[in-house]
Amino acid sequence: MPTKAGTKSTANKKTTKGSSKSGSARGHTGKTHAPPSMHSGMLYKDMVNIARSKGIPIYQNGTRLTKSELEKKIKRSK
């Protein structure tokens, strides 16, 4: 298989340039896979809404609670 080093390197350069360019220009459209939040049953937004309705504080010492922390608190309050 006679492959020239020159053509190979230029091809590689082209692909990397193209993908990085289109990715930065388009933002999130380049992502084909769903974000991790889409796979889980409950979204973070849902958790926050449940916590609010139950009167559970979402913020703890100045920072927002993580999804798992909110989940624990919601389960405890049931």
From Swiss-Prot:
Induction conditions: Expressed in the early phase of the viral replicative cycle.
Extent of Low complexity compositional bias: 1-25
Keyword annotations from UniProtKB, A to Z: DNA-binding, Late protein, Virion
Intrachain S-S bonds: none
Location(s), subcellular: Virion
Gene Ontology molecular function terms on file: DNA binding
Entry keyword DNA-binding: yes
GO cellular component: virion component
Region (Disordered): 1-41
Main function: May play a role in genome packaging through direct interaction with viral DNA. Binds to ssDNA and dsDNA with the same apparent affinity in vitro.
Family classification: Belongs to the asfivirus P10 family.
Protein name as annotated: Structural DNA-binding protein p10
High-level lineage: Viruses, Varidnaviria, Bamfordvirae, Nucleocytoviricota, Pokkesviricetes
